[in-house]
Amino acid sequence: MEHLPGVKPLTWKGDLAARMVAGMDRYLRRATAERAAQRERYWKRDTTSWERHEKSIAPNRKRLAKCLGVVDDRVPADMQVVAWAGTSLDRPSAERPSEAAPYTIHAVRWHVLPGLTAEGLLLEPTAPAVANVVALGDADQTPEQVADGFGGALAASGCRVLIPTLINRDCEWSGVAGILTNQPHREFIYRAAYELGRHVIGAEIQKVLAAVDWFDQFRLPMGVMGYGEGGLIAFNAAALDTRLGLAVVSGYFGPREKLFAEPIYRNTWRLLEEFGDAEIASLVAPRFLIVEHCPFPAVSGPPQVEGRSGAAPGAITTPSVAAVEKELKRAMGLLGDLPPSFGLIEADAPGSLLTFEFIQEVSGGAVCAPDELPTVPLPPGLPDPQARLKRQFDEMVEWTQALMREAEYVRRDYWAKADATDVKLWEKTTKAYRKRFHEEVIGALPAPDMPPNPRGRQVFATEAYTGYEVVLDVYPDVFAYGILLVPHDIAPGERRPVVVCQHGLEGRPQDVADPRIEENCYHYFACRLAQRGFVTFSPQNPYIGMDKFRVLQRMANPLGLSLFSFIIPQHQRILDFLKTLPYVDGKRMAFYGLSYGGKTAVRVPAVVTDYCLSVCSGDFNEWIWKNASARAPLSYLRTGEYEMFEFDLGMTFNYAEMTYLICPRPFMVERGHWDGVSWDEWVSYEFAKTRYRYDLLGIGERTEIEYFNGPHEINGVGAFAFLEKHLRG
């Protein structure tokens, strides 16, 4: 191996791409356990008193709110009783329960955020209320079903009860431009909201807290009780708002380290880095927390509907009572000598009599446990639950669309501290943005501390160049791998520029760098560049294996990481290795990628400044619209690529802002008119911001866009000229 001095022989056999994905899987499983044990580094608890403890955990509570997307100021709740055709709420008897009934039932609506309301049922005790409670069923339960169960029991016990509608797991309305998917409604909203720094969980927490805002006027004790998805909402609402003196969490609490296997609408950026259920419970203390362990909602996956697809896998299973008890004891242990008011109850179903006895005890007898769980018949004329759910779904979708439209202006404010007076000031003042992009959006892993241990082998040779497979260690179980093409005409002592040529989704290095494979959308571009005299390296990126790699993203996100958390150090290691080769010019190393490789072209060079330029092919876009639009048929809201969504990206970095981090280095877009990843108008709109930035810095010649009559493919005309100009010119 004359072109690989000092490189050991590569002896690995089999599918190296599958080996890479499997190794990252092992790494992330270890990291999940390790980081759970390291959470205390984020906590500065003072357990000398409850007052000091409350003050010491305030930053943690704020960070939890950020993780959950609870970041917007609410509007006044303005509770409204909904009037329906043919029924007057002022008329007694015929349309309302009898005077002997322990409570009355009203359909209500209240305001939450601009453009977002809540709808549900208000259960008003006949006697003066002794407490106010928000009761939340599972996502697939209607408020009427909750009123017929523990919600009604709470009202019969003397509580004023508000029961919000939650977005369910059906897929009836999940689609874009008439193209329907089998995504649960919760997933459909999650996708758009997540991209914009919000969450379906956070929106429903806000609905609960808006109810609490309304309850404030009554000056009564307040609590929250929920089952299943409602238990999740209740638990986190109580952790965030100290006005809630009691939380009953049923069918939810337990160890959270397998969050990646739960439905994707529970995926929460960086949650497990700082919070398990025990840590969240510690935010509820010293207030009362009752964990009612009963069978969780049975969810084996997304709806199975003929002709529909695109949903992410994910299931809900019931943990053992021992696992739940262990997590609750861990919560108690976090509080030192402070005595928490936590209780664990085993039950067959949510809202057991034993739970109500516990509520009676902790309320000092104000809330009386019933001998049985009485209910009141629903009055006639209540709004249609399905129509109400549709209104709430449509409204929440439109809420995400309003956020999407506003995002551009939020980003402008976010970027206000970048000084574009001249190139030097631009480079200086964008360093902080690069750091934030890497650490807060991509998720930064520590720099590798193990040697690269390069291994290689020759895999083919042509008249113009020789091809080698190269493997480099990055982290335990994580390696970089790709194909190096070395032209034959390099003179002794000569140093050539390098082009790193990146494949797309489900691709391999061979797709771009092996002349023996069949023609494809890459058109042998690494080989053609090698024929032009460039050294090329074609890495294997880990977006291969369908759900196997997408599960990596699921495991990574709760740790504040992503696929690109691995891809960035892989590429840095590759460039460091290339610099050691005697025929490589380490100052002239460029990037050129198609599709997911184009996605890489705006993210990796934005962080890895050893790349001297970047060419993005078949991916440049108004990326936030692409991910969040509920109108455009090319939106990722309707596809099976559920790993695409990056938390809060929309409010910080669109593709133009990513190119700001590449600037002043040269940057180019290659765009086929027929490429279905976007429309020319979107691409041009976003690129105009890039060109504007380069032009105003006086370096407009460093950025270009080429349109060509073609589909999703490497064109290799203008881009090749761009490489020649900036690497050799």
Feature annotation, model-predicted:
Residues H199, A238, P302-Q304, G310-A311, ...:
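N-terminal cap/leader regions of alpha/beta-hydrolase-fold enzymes
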Residues Q141-G149, I179-P184, E195-Q206, M225, ...:
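Alpha-helix capping and helix-loop boundary segments enriched in small/acidic/polar residues
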Residues M1-A118, P128, Y194-V200, D213, ...:
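Alpha/beta-hydrolase-fold serine-hydrolase catalytic core, especially in secreted/extracellular enzymes
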Residues A210-L283, D576-G650:
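Primarily recognizes the serine-hydrolase "nucleophile elbow" in alpha/beta-hydrolase
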Residues L123, L136-G137, P164, M225-F235, ...:
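Generic beta-strand/beta-sheet core signal
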Residues V130-A131, S157-R160, L220-P221, T242-L246, ...:
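Loop/turn elements at helix/coil->beta-strand transitions in domains of secreted/extracellular proteins
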Residues A129-D216, Y252-Y265, I490-T580, W625-A630:
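Cap/lid segment of the alpha/beta-hydrolase catalytic domain
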Residues N168-R169, G254, F296-P297, Y543-I544, ...:
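Residue-level marker for beta-strand->alpha-helix junctions and adjacent short loops that shape enzyme
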